[in-house]
Amino acid sequence: MTLPLLGPMSLSGFEHPWFFLFFFVVIGLVALYIVVQLARQKRMLRFANMELLESVAPKQPSRMRHLPAVLMILSLVSFTIAMAGPTHDVRIPRNRAVVMLVIDVSQSMRATDVAPNRLTAAQEAAKQFADQLTPGINLGLIAYAGTATVLVSPTTNRESTKTAIDKLQLADRTATGEGIFTALQAIATVGAVIGGGDEPPPARVVLMSDGKETVPSNPDNPKGAYTAARTAKDQGVPISTVSFGTPYGYVEINEQRQPVPVDDEMLKKIADLSGGEAFTASSLEQLKQVFTNLQEQIGYETIKGDASVGWLRLGAGVLALAALGALLINRRLPN
């Protein structure tokens, strides 16, 4: 949590937990204070002239006189927590990652169950995704129907990606597996160029489709979608699938209506096999929200940040109050 004036504070993820041994010192000080107070009380009871004692001493000494000591102990507790090095989760933009946006442009994407049609709505949401994605991420674009084509190699230039999205054209058949394999090849190519470390940059495939794979007919074939998803899993590239459309979509072929219901099941299995996550959307608004959620997941990474400063500030503030209280209540610093 983050508190005003103090900053982030946490009670987890300690980097130097051995500093908690200092709590034994704090406990010792508490015990010493109690012993001193009891001894002080005994000395007062041995006062020779009890009548004089009752006349000069308050009948019930104020408990406020213990406040400075309590505050000092609390400040030591706060300082001990700070020295133990607590951490908290910090989200920072990624600047070394690759995302391949793979869009289905088969004929079923001209269905009008999503206004004005599936492809146009997908184009609008995809361009929003490109705009929202953090600037340091390399974004590429692949369109697939019967074959897959890399329209934009992974780049931080969002304008080129959006221009290519606007130019998407419908084609026959649906080769989802080829679209995934093409994305994996593009990721491997750019990863070798921008590696910048011992490991390749983190990568993700975002697959948007509305229907079942038709080429090949069996998704478990060597070039099928399920085989491609397993390959993505082996390469450490999760696939986020977005199934887009409704069960009532249709297209007209030779003046006859051909049902093209969305196939959520296949896309979910692709995501599961790859270690990714499946999303569904049946309207443009839902699709935009899905891409916003994806941007939040992909565009940022969570790291451990220091959360000790807040405890140091709290300890210093409480210690100052202890000193002030000692001067006002006891007219001296607590001992």
From Swiss-Prot:
InterPro entries in alphabetical order: Aerotolerance_reg_N (IPR024163), UPF0353 (IPR022933), UPF0353/GerABKA_families (IPR050768), VWF_A (IPR002035), vWFA_dom_sf (IPR036465)
Primary location recorded for the protein, binned into one broad class: membrane
Compartmental location: Cell membrane
GO cellular component: plasma membrane
Entry's transmembrane regions: 18-38, 67-87, 309-329
Domain VWFA span(s) in chain numbering: 98-294
Keyword terms, alphabetized: Cell membrane, Membrane, Transmembrane, Transmembrane helix
Recorded topology in the membrane: Multi-pass membrane protein
NCBIfam families, alphabetized: PRK13685.1 (NF010238)
Family: Belongs to the UPF0353 family.
PANTHER family documented for this protein: LEUCINE ZIPPER PROTEIN 4, SPORE GERMINATION PROTEIN
Protein known as: UPF0353 protein Mflv_3659
Organism: Mycolicibacterium gilvum (strain PYR-GCK)
